[in-house]
Amino acid sequence: RYDTQMIVQATRSVARSTVARMVANGARNTHEWTTEKDDMLKAFDAAGITAAFMEPEQGGFIEGPKNLALALIGFELAWVDGGAATTSLASDLALAPIHERGTEEQKQYYMTRCVPPGVDGVQWRGAFALTEPLPYVGVDTGVLSGKISIVEWEEGKEPILQVEKRGRFITNMDFADFVTAAVDSGDERIKGSCMIIIEEGDEGQFDRGAVTHKLVHQLSSTRDPIFSLKVPASRIVGGYDVVDGVIVPRHSHGQIIEAVFRRTRVPVALMSSAKLLS
C-alpha cells in the first residue's frame, strides 16, 4: 500500500535524523522533558506520524485497519530509540479508548483536535492513565483504586462527577492536554467502572506529578500524576444511561481495555523486537 510505504519512509527519516541526533547529543542523559525532546513531537507532526492513527474524516490519511502502519512506525523509531517509539505509541494509546468505544461526539471532538494543526491552530496531545501506585509493588493493571462520584445532579441537567485518580508511570504527562483515565465507582449512584476523559482546564487539581526516573526510554515523558477534578458525565467514554436513578456506563473500563489492547499487541510486539535487534 502506497500510504503505508510513505509513512514508513517518513518515519525512518525522522528516526535516523531528528531522533538519532538527539541520542548523539546526549538527550538520554536526563529524565526531564526538554525543548529538544519537544521538537521531536513537531517532527512527528510534520512527518505524518501523529495523524497516522486518525480516520480520514478526522484528518488522517490511512483508510481501513492501521495496525500494520502503526507497528511499522513503532519499529522504525524503536530501531533508533525505544523512548521515541514509546512517545508515538502512547499518543495513539491515549486516543484508543475514544476510537474504540467513544461516542461519535467524543471521537469528533478529541480526534480532530489531535491532528496537526489542531482546531483554531491549537493542537492537543493526550495520555492514557491506567496503572496506579501500589506500595512496595510498583503497579498492577488488575488493581483499580481511582474513583468517581457525583457531586452535583440537578433535575433535568447533566450530572457533574468528581474524579480522583493517581497515576503511576504515565507516558506523555509533561505535555498532555487531556487524559483518558480508568476509574471505579465510589458512589452508589454510579454502577461499576468506566474510563473517563479529563482535561487540563477542568476545575480542580491537574497535577502532572513527579518525574519518573527510568533505566531506558528517556526520550519519552513519564510522570506519576495526581488528578482531583470535576467533569461532566458526558466525558464517560462511550456515554452512559440512567437506570432507576443510577448512572450506568455503557462500557466498563475492562471492556474498553480489552478492545484497546487487542489492537495494540502487534505494534508493541514489533517495537519490542526492534529494540532487541538494534
State where each predicted segment sits:
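Short acidic, glycine/serine/threonine-rich loops at helix termini
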Residues: 99, 137-143, 173-176, 207-209, ...
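A short, Trp-centered hydrophobic/proline-enriched beta-strand micro-motif
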Residues: 121-132
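Glycine-rich beta->alpha junctions and the first turn(s) of the following alpha-helix
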Residues: 210-278
